[in-house]
């Protein structure tokens, strides 16, 4: 049976029915539904990334970093990490089977990520 992404946990924000709510010490949980999230990407993120897609989610981890997830289906992820002030964000396109690599990548930025499959 193929692995399916069900939740992503990051930082200290919790997404409740499309509305980000800060709760501590709990983490962000973004429920995977039909290939996209209910939060639209900000125009700032779109302009900085040069990528225009429907759906997705954006989240400022802190005052320095922005993290954006795109989901095409249950098997592919696109992750964008950008630092405020940088012109070009870091873009990673990953298969679900490489979630360990994604977690290791985020650890470089001191970001803990939990993905439930």
What name fits each language-model region?
Residues 1-8:
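Mixed-charge, Lys/Arg-rich low-complexity intrinsically disordered regions
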Residues 27-40:
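Short, structured interface segments
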Residues 13, 18-30:
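Short beta-strand-centered aromatic/proline hotspots
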Residues 70-96:
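Intrinsically disordered, low-complexity regulatory segments enriched in Ser/Thr/Pro
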Residues 9, 13, 43-45:
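Conserved short "hinge" loops at termini or chain/domain junctions
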Residues 50-75:
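Amphipathic, interaction-prone secondary-structure segments
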Residues 40-53:
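Amphipathic alpha-helical segments
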Residues 88-117:
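Ampiphathic alpha-helical segments that act as solvent-exposed interaction surfaces
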């Amino acid at each position: 049976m193929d692995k399916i992404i069900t939740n992503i946990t990051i930082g200290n924000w919790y997404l409740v029915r499309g509305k980000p709510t800060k709760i501590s010490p709990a983490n962000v949980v973004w429920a995977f539904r039909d290939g996209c999230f209910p939060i639209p990407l900000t125009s700032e993120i779109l302009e900085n990334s040069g990528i225009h897609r429907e759906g997705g989610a954006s989240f400022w981890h802190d005052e320095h970093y922005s993290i954006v997830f795109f989901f095409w289906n249950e098997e592919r992820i696109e992750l964008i990490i950008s630092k405020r002030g940088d012109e070009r964000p870091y873009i990673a396109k990953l298969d679900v089977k490489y979630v360990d690599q994604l977690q290791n990548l985020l650890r470089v930025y001191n970001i803990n990520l939990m993905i439930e499959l």
